[in-house]
Amino acid sequence: MNRPPEEYVHVTEDKLLAFAVACFESAGLDHEHAHTIGRLLVNSDMRGVRTHGTRAVNRYCRAFEEGNTNPQPDVRQIHEAPTGVVIDGDGTLGYLPMVRATEAAIDRASKLGL
C-alpha cells in the first residue's frame, strides 16, 4: 500500500519560493523568469498537487543547464487578433509564455468589455 511518510520537514511558503527562485537563477534564468516558474510550482505545492510542484525544480534546472531548454528566451507575440494572441516561447518551458499569453488575453478581454 502506498502510504505517506509519517514525518515531514516543514518549509514555509516564502522559504520554498526563495529556494526555487535561487535554483533557477543559478541555472541561468533572470529574476522575472525564475520567480514566475518558482511561484507557479510553489502554488501547486500549496494546493496539494505535488506532482506539478517544486519536485520539478531539479529536473528543470538540469534541462536549462544542459542546454535542452532555453534559460534566456525571447518570449514574444508573433500574431494577434482582437480576442487572442500567439506567443513564441523561444525554446523555454511553457510557464513564462503562458503567463504572458494570459496577461494578453486578459487585456484583450477588458478592451472588449468582458
How does the language model describe each region?
Residues 1-27:
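Generic N-terminal amphipathic, Lys/Arg-enriched alpha-helix
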Residues 4, 25-28, 43-50:
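N-terminal and secondary-structure boundary signal
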Residues 104-114:
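Conserved catalytic cysteine-centered active-site region
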Residues 21, 44, 48, 81-91, ...:
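Glycine-/proline-rich flexible loop or hinge segments
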Residues 29-36, 51-53:
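Flexible, glycine/charged-enriched surface loops at secondary-structure junctions
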Residues 52-106:
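Active-site cofactor/substrate anionic-group-binding motifs, chiefly glycine-
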Residues 15-19, 36, 104:
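A non-catalytic, amphipathic alpha-helix used as a structural packing/dimerization or gating element
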